[in-house]
Each structure stands twice: as structure tokens, then as C-alpha cells.
């Protein structure tokens, strides 16, 4: 064994990311904007733990063939399995059922937090990501679904997206259920095949109609040589499914007529069309008809949806990993799930909701150059010119004076010299630095260097000697004028921005 201790390799787990100060600021700004819209619609905050008992979460995870294969799980001291939540909806169902007697009905809540998926990571596909959900539990009316859709549109506009940047795409799972019943996919024994069909339809934007046709049939071979087994439907059954996907027309009325034709006399299917018609009337009455559109290809991957389903899609182009232009795509979605709470209460409790993917939104806003950027400067840095205890106490006193005046400030606590300290201040984006050597301390004086003005003047003064002699953007003041002098510099810098 080597006497030299082996170093542990610093490495980030696959599928996870670190977030910088700038990213956190952008996230917090976006969250505040979305929260403002949610609360305007009457929703209240709720927080649930990131761990739930595994059986509470249920077996609803999309894109997984094996139950609970996509979750992170552990056993507690009682040998009960617990899992990290994979969405924010299943925990809400548990909370509502557990507190059924005391909660108002309908119950409007919003939840924000990280969710976890134990899936293969890839470009833009993470194992931990943030969602911001809003749900209405306890009402069967599709007016609730319509309100959720309108709130989703308002949230995107609050973030700076324009009408032409996005669309809320709307469908109804009852219509899809009608088509699946018409081709014989009913009963528990056909559950896996139904799920394969749902996944195939969900890939329409990615693979197109022909790709979906292959996935509904024997399967699809991608460019890398990987083969995805299909749903093994017959040609006539495939045609029935594709007829649904191509039902979108120029107007909402024409699309609804096409959907009526697809479902025929199927009672549940016709009910689904009627619900879409009711929602469309609400959108038209409130000026949302061009932002929320019926799209028969929307299915949503989760099995628990029972009625209207919706997806927020960004319409602008971005470059993919191969340098090709593609539509940015989905940044959130949701729908009605009337059976989820029934797992705990034995009776259906109507519910509907929407989830926004915060991480996807950040990427989208970056592409539009609309990501919130922190405009406030870094802290004022008091340099450590002398490390004698008396001097350090004086430096700390300066820092506290600035903080008490509401000015961000810090004392340089490293061991480097003046040159490295100035570089540190630049890296911290400090607006100015405070300097007091032994002579200044004896004279009760302080030097303050305006780094913003100094940078500007450095582009104008080319001669080093002139620069050293003029000491531009640097002033000397009495100790008692420290706060006022720094405030004057900050006011001047702020005025120059406008």
C-alpha cells in the first residue's frame, strides 16, 4: 500500500449539474414572475418532502417499462421503501388525501421543487431538474382546465415570451381512449401495448408521421443502429391512430368536426370533443383563442391523465447537437387526472394541473437573449494592506460601516499582496475598493479607487507614466467620510448606465 494518501477525484455525478450565482439569480427571478401569476389566479403555496413512500408515488413514470425502475429508492429503518419524487403531482395527491377533511374544495395550490429521474442522462436530459406546478383539486368542470391553460399562457408572457413565440397545445385523453378502444386496446392485459402506443404518438414532433407509423408497427431503427420495438399494430389499426394525429385543421371548429368523425358514436370520445368545445368557447371569450389551440397529437406520457391534456410549446428555432435547426419544443404540460387521489380514498376526486420545467425555460430564454441578468454590482472590497491585529480590526470596522448603510461589502481575507487583491476585486466585479495603509491609518485617511471609472479611463490614457502620476479614479477622504464617498461613487456609476 502506498504511503502517499490517494486523492479523491473531484467529479460531478452524471445527470446532475452545479448552478452558478448567475444561474441562481435567473432562476429566482423567473420563479418570482411565475409565482406572481399563480397567486393572481388565487393559488397558494405548498411544499412536500422530496422523499415519499414508494407505493405512494405509484407506477406512473413515463418512458419506463419496469415499475419504479426510473426512481431513486432506499429502505428506511422499518424496511419500508422510500423514493425521491419523480414529479410534484403524486405528492400533491397524497397530501390532499391525507388532509381531505380540512382543505377547501376546490383546492388551489402551487408547488416548486426538484424532481428526480433515475434515467440514462444525455444532452439536455438530467436526473435532477426543477418544476413549478399549479393544480386545482376537487372540481370536475373543464372551466378549471381552461383556467389552467390561460394561466400557463399568462406565465409565459410574464417571462417575456411574445404571442408568436409559443402555443398551448390542447387535446383530450377521452378522444384517444375512444380510438384505442376502437382498435381493441382495452383491459389490463393490453396495458403495456397501450403504453407503447402512447409513447409512439408522443414522438410525433421528434420523428414525424412516418417515424410514428414505424413505432406503432414492428419498430424503428434509428441512425445509430439502435432498434426500438414497436406496438405491433396491424396496418388498419395504425391508420386509425394516424387519422387522429392528422385531425388538426385550419380552425378550431374544423378540428372539432374532424375529431367527431374520428370517434364516431363512441360516447366517451364524443364527451371529450364536447369538453374541448367548451374550453374553446372560454378561450375565445377571453382573447386566448390564438394562444391555445386544439392539437390531436398531444397525449402526454403519464398514464394517470383522464381528460383534457395540454402542452406549452415554444415555436422558435434553435440549433440541435448536429447543428440543424429544430423547433425548441415543450417546456411544460399537464392535464386532468381524476383518478390519482382515488388510490388513497377509494373514490374519484377530480383534479387538473400544469407543470413548468424551469431548467428548460432557462435554456429557452438564453436562446432568445432574455435570460434575467443581475445588474447590481459586486461588493465593495476593503483591501488587507496590513495584517496587524489593530489594522484588521480597523478594516473590519470599515466593512461594518458600509453594511450598516446598506452597501454590500467584504474584507479581503486571503493572504495575497496588493496586486492579487486588485485582481480579486475585479473578479468579484467590485464597483470600488477601499485602501488604507499604515500611513493613511496614522493620518486617519482612506483611499477609494473607482474600478468602473478606472477601467474607462485606462482606455483613454495610453502612457504608463501619466497613468501612475495622475492616479485616475482614485480619491483620498477622511475616515468619517467613507460611507458618503462610497455612496457618491455608486450613485455616479448608476447614473452612467442610463
Swiss-Prot record:
Keywords, alphabetical: Aminoacyl-tRNA synthetase, ATP-binding, Cytoplasm, Ligase, Nucleotide-binding, Protein biosynthesis
Enzyme Commission numbers on file: 6.1.1.21
Catalytic reactions of this protein: tRNA(His) + L-histidine + ATP = L-histidyl-tRNA(His) + AMP + diphosphate + H(+)
GO MF annotation, one: histidine-tRNA ligase activity
GO biological process entries: histidyl-tRNA aminoacylation
EC category name: ligase
Entry keyword Protease: no
GO annotation, cellular component aspect: cytoplasm
InterPro entries the record matches: aa-tRNA-synth_II (IPR006195), aa-tRNA-synth_II/BPL/LPL (IPR045864), Anticodon-bd (IPR004154), Anticodon-bd_dom_sf (IPR036621), His-tRNA-ligase (IPR015807), HisRS-like_core (IPR041715), HisRS/HisZ (IPR004516), HisRS_anticodon (IPR033656)
NCBIfam families, alphabetized: hisS
Record-stated family: Belongs to the class-II aminoacyl-tRNA synthetase family.
Family matches, as HAMAP family: His_tRNA_synth
PANTHER family associated with the record: HISTIDINE--TRNA LIGASE, HISTIDYL-TRNA SYNTHETASE
Name the UniProt record assigns to this protein: Histidine--tRNA ligase
Organism, as annotated: Bartonella quintana (strain Toulouse) (Rochalimaea quintana)
Lineage summary: Bacteria, Pseudomonadati, Pseudomonadota, Alphaproteobacteria, Hyphomicrobiales
Gene: hisS
